Every structure is written in structure tokens, then in C-alpha cells.
Amino acid sequence: MTTLFDYLLWRGDLPLSADPFHEVDGVILARFTYMPFHRVLRRDSLTPTTVEAVCRALLALPDIETAVRRRGDTDLLRALVESPRYKGMELTAYADRLDAESQTQFSAITVKLEEGHYCVAYRGTDNTLIGWKEDFNMGFVCPVPGQKLAVDYLQRAARRLPGRLTVCGHSKGGNFAVYAAAFCGDEIQDRIEAVYNYDGPGFDSKVLSEPGYQRICQKIQTFVPQSSVVGMLLGHEEKYIIVHSEQTFLQQHDTYSWEVRQKHFHYLDTVDNSSRFVDYTLKAWLAQMTPAQREQFVDAIYEVMRQTNAHTLHQMNENWLASAASILKSAKNMDEETRQAVTHAAGLLLSSAKDGLLRVVLEQEAEKGE
């Protein structure tokens, strides 16, 4: 199967003047945002640094293999260094914020693609518990702090940089990209050529009905793999494009697993049954709870995980035995009101899962009868 690495081999020598920026370029930059830029870049610096220089600096780090998030990240750095299409692009305004008190995890960077054309790229969820907590907060509050920061970042970039804009991001970064484009203002929206959302969650009906969202909707391109979970959360007014991934279920969230055909992904007609099941289950589950109930459930789970004293999911996995013991102890020590809230939410989830499974089975039977 051909992936973005094959694309870099085939098309990595073509300048944007010969082959304009498109969806595969966007996913490469969205993936690039996850690199540990804090090791080699000054935050908020407006001094341009080329992609090649940043990649070389990262590859020179003695611990780069463990500093990156995905196995393919160092391969991407090496490929970008050798790519005439990308290596001359300039990076500015690296932003990175992690705040436990406001439960905010936000990072973005601006890429000068060519003269008069810039890409604002947002990072998705990192490995921190705070980052995941902000994700879950989206289920009961909007905007979360990261979404507000995303709007502010895009507005500042647009004021500073003349010309065309492209906005992109993966996972929560895709959600931030769409939210920022929807609420940045009409003048900036007119300069936006495309918004690329790679398997990022959607929004509640209030956001989807906002004039700013409706105005930018036709420029949004949302891509989800066939077993998408994250990208199917909440609502999407824009049409989403289903792409083929060689991985299974949650592993399909990894864009390195997406199949690329020349300058497009390999498109599919529909998501698979597992994605439909999760979609039906979670939407029904959330619909049965008030925002306050969702918040109480999420806060309770987060507090239990926080008692492990781990700051990242990786730390929890490394010390899984101690983490499990701490989680069990914290769960036992829940006050009665919280325990009842968690039990109630878990019961609703189980009921929604049963209904979701039945709905998928009935749909399959109906398809066979056609």
C-alpha cells in the first residue's frame, strides 16, 4: 500500500508552482506539528526558520527516537530534509501552551508555503492527561480554551501576513482548524483557500448553526478513515471524505496508515460497521445526559487518573501496575454522589451500545435485502 512516504518520493521534488498545495501536503504538515519543536525553536519567534533547518536540528538530538510520538516521525523528518518541495518552506510563530489549571493543551505553527501563501497548522492531542481532558471537555463545553487560542492565533497570523491562507490540523488540531476558520471573521475567511480537518471531532448543533461556520463550510474538507472514531464524534455539517487505512479500528487515527494515490487519498464510499457502531453509541449516550452530567462524569474519571501522579499516558503505561492500583483505590474512595453519577453514565453507555449494535445489525440485514 502506498502512503505519504511514497508521495514524498514521487512528488517531493515538485515545487508548488508546478503542483499547488493539496490534501496530502496538508496531512504532512499536520503530522509535522507533532514534532518536539520546543527542543529547537523559540516560542512565538517571528524569525523564519526553514523546514530543512528544523528537521536537521531535530534529527541531531541524541534522544530523537524517543522524543517523537510515532515510529514514522523520524522517517518523516529525514524525508522532508531531502524534499525540494518542503525543505525551503519557512516556519514562524511556534506556539505551545500546556496549563493544568485551565485544562488547556494548545500548539500551532505557521508555515510559509510560497510567496503570498501561508499555512496555519494546529497540533492535535499530545500524550498528556491534560490534553486528553481538554478533548473530553468538548463533550460538554464549547469553546474550550484551546479553541479560543486557535481563533486568536489565526487572527494574529492573518494580521501579520498578507496573502492567501490554508488552515489544517489532525485530531483535536483539525477541530481547532475548523473552529478558528469559523470564528476568525469575514475578512480573514475570504482569504482562506481551504481548511483541512484530518479525523478531527465535530461540534454541537449550536456551533454548526453559527453564521461563521456556515460561511466557511464549503471550504472545509474533513477526512476520516473507514473505522473512524475520533472524527465521528459530535456533529459535522460539512461533508466528510472517507479514506482507506491499512490499520484497524483506533489505529486508523494514525495518518501514516492512510493510503495515498498520487496527490489524493484512496477514497471509500462509506465508513465500516465498527465506525457506525461507535458513532451511534456515543451520539445516543451523549444525548441522554445533560452537559452538567457529562462534566461530572469526565471530571470524575480524570480525577481518578490524576491520582496516579502520572502526567502522560505513557507514564501510566510504563507503571501500569502501580497506576491500576492507584485507580482502584481512588475509585473506591469516591463520594457517594460521584459514584452514582459514574454508575449512571456507565449504565447509559452500555444501553446505548446495545441499541447501536442492534441498529448496525438491522442496517446490514436491510442492505442484504436490497
Can you annotate each of these PLM segments?
Residues 168-173, 177:
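Gly/Ala-rich beta-loop-alpha elbow adjacent to hydrolase catalytic centers
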Residues 177-186:
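Short glycine-enriched nucleophile-adjacent loop
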